[in-house]
Amino acid sequence: NVAITDDLYRGIEDALSDTVNDRINQWKESTHDSRFESGCARIDIGTRWSLNDVIGRNMESKIYDKSIIVSAMNEEGQSFCEDVLTTDEYIEKKKRTAPEIWEAEYQQQPVDMKGRLFNELKFVSKDEFQEINKTNPIEGCIGYVDVSDQGTDYTSVAICAVIKKQLFIVDYLMTRDNTDITIPQTAAMLDKWKVSYCRVESNSMGAMFSRQLQTQTKTRILQVHNTQNKITRIIMSSAHVMNSMTFVRNGDNQSELFIQNVLSFSKEGKNKNDDAPDCLAGLSIFVQSMFKNLS
């Protein structure tokens, strides 16, 4: 048996639309993948429009045994196959094509690859983290909450665990649900990991969120008001995030949504949502103030 998908996206607009991309990913995971039989080979074919498209997510999760990337023109600027299109014909196409479209449609470089800030994150799987944790107990946990204040924003939560002077991001929340859902969810996360302290950004809805959260958890909730420009804060914290933090890939939708939001963040500022990177920036600042010996 072989399961094949081919060009799930009509074009760049589909791949860069959160709504369309989520719908395609949901169809792939539920309708398509539910038809797999034991031992079924799986082949996904398509243009690499976005880091967050179906193929991009699967590559990040290391689902594929092998990935074959065919660029229209090689590093020497020659056609990959003169019988398909000659080098001169590709050169003419490149002149008439927007650079980001050329890179994605012809060179298989996702349009959101250029300008990625968090391009060197460190990951471990859930199983790998559990193996580490077997012989090395968690010494303490802190958390950070970036509260949604607009309809398109996400409430983002990250939990950081300290093991032998190493920082592991062990749990995540990334949701547009209302506070009647997100506050109990956050409280449950904090209690699950026995988080000692959690900062909540108090801008806008954050103050109300933190007060209600404190009534539902044993964790000490600390409000923080950020005055620094968000993008500046994210960029300034990025080195610490990449150098000092290891991200546990739990395999659930929340963690993958959070991680993909971080990976797709562009330092050039073309971001539909930057809630997860903003959450990590806040967590990074908090970690460095709490654990000066780890910084």
Language-model segments: residues:
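Conserved RecA-like P-loop NTPase helicase motor core
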Residues: 274-277
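ATPase catalytic-site recognition across NTP-hydrolyzing enzymes
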Residues: 77-145
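Acidic two-metal-ion nuclease catalytic site recognized across multiple nuclease folds
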Residues: 172, 283-295
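Short catalytic-loop micro-motif centered on adjacent basic/acidic residues
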Residues: 41-45, 144, 196-201
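Mg2+-dependent endonuclease catalytic cores in nucleic-acid-processing enzymes, primarily RNase H-like
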Residues: 49-63, 69-71, 77-79, 88-92, ...
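Gly/Thr-rich phosphate-binding beta-strand-loop-beta motif of the actin/hexokinase/Hsp70
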Residues: 135-162, 279
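Short, glycine/acidic-enriched loop or turn micro-motifs at the edges of active sites
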Residues: 9-10, 149, 174, 204
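Signature of the SF2 helicase/ATPase Hel1-core->accessory helical subdomain module
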Residues: 2-76
